[in-house]
Swiss-Prot record:
Residues 366-376 have a biased composition (Pro residues). This is Tetraspanin-14. It is found in: Cell membrane; Cytoplasmic vesicle membrane; Endosome membrane; Early endosome membrane. One of its GO terms (molecular function) is protease binding. Belongs to the tetraspanin (TM4SF) family. The gene is tsp-14.
Amino acid sequence: MPHRAPRRFMKTAPGACDWEQCLLMGSGEPTRARAVVSSSHKQRKPRQEISACLKWLVFLLNSIVFLVGVGILALGVYLFIKDFREVKLVDIILNPAILISIFGFSICVVSFFGFMGALRDNIFLLKCFAACVFLSYILVVAVTLVFFTLFYTDTTEGLSANWLLLYAVKNYHTNRNLAEIMDALQENLECCGVSSIAQGYRDWNMSYQFNCTNSNPQPEKCGVPFSCCRKSVISEAAGSSNPLLPAMRSLECWQNALTKRPGDLEHDIYTRGCLQPLRTLFESHAVHVGAFVALLIVPVCISVCLTNILAKQVDHQRYLLEREARRNDRRRKRDHNRRDQLNSLDLLEEGKFNNASANATRPRPPDIPPPLPPIEHVPRKKSRNASSSPTRKPKSAGVENAAARRKRTATTTRTPPAAAGPAPTPQATTTNRTHQWVLQQTDLVPQKSKS
């Protein structure tokens, strides 16, 4: 039979070998296989799912907006400190410095969520930024609708522009912010009072400071604010050579204005109310306001979409990292199991060689078994062919039956084969034969016929 060449060492799996091959190679090959196991699997990095361009775009845009918000917040705080006044709950809306500060702070917080979430790949901050931007747009839309409702509602009761202006007139002396707002409206819109077109200035009779009642102790009794005076009167007085004339003329224009007729005051103060000019101003810019709010949805949608895309990319990248970590754990466990198997092969090889060396040093047993001990033979008496005794009579049926019963009794008293003890020795065999011969001589056991 031709000699068969040994098979080459082939790996059945990355870093593993055939069991028979490893067993035949000895203790050196499994060690080399372990090196293959440890070096076959390299740490692979998952693919990059986060777009660097998108990430840094979101970061830069939100950083710029954050700096703008910081500037607006600083301006509001500066204005509030420069003209510090008592702050009430209504001043949150009426005080421009507080409004500017709140607006700047809101921009800072929202933009901080955006650029910090993009920088740190934080899904929670990115989603907070998108939600805040969307809610801010909803708030802008709601405020715009409120303004449209105020100026296009003619009811004197309830929330309307007429009600707000009357509230400002009644609380002119109690809130400095309201006083400044009313003065700015009357100077810029060239009006005085609220509602009436010809006699709007008479609405100041509802003010605690300017009413004409006998219980009013104020020096401004029956007057109107200085902002109701016409600019032409002040400018004419300012062009005079008398430096005291502008001050005197400004005092004369508003004093006792509520006691005079509109025709007597046309050259000194504005007589029409501020509601109609304010409504006309809003109507002229209503289209621009609506277009601005409508176009504002474009950058809002872009920022929300970009942020959500970035958040999904970060989430998918985390999923890939976790999946790769799980794969690495399974790979390490598999390599550990392979090392254990190879170690067991080494131990098996060492045990096989140790057994072979022990068998080589142990003396070889002889091929011929040792002789059995000699069997002692008891000399057997020869039976006489002819007996000198007289001829025996044939046994009767009763004697034969008694002999059969004794035979059955002796058979039942013997030990069953299943419960028999160890194999009988030669001496016991000889004794049994002698006992059988004695029984045969006494005719208790029938003799076998010789053919």
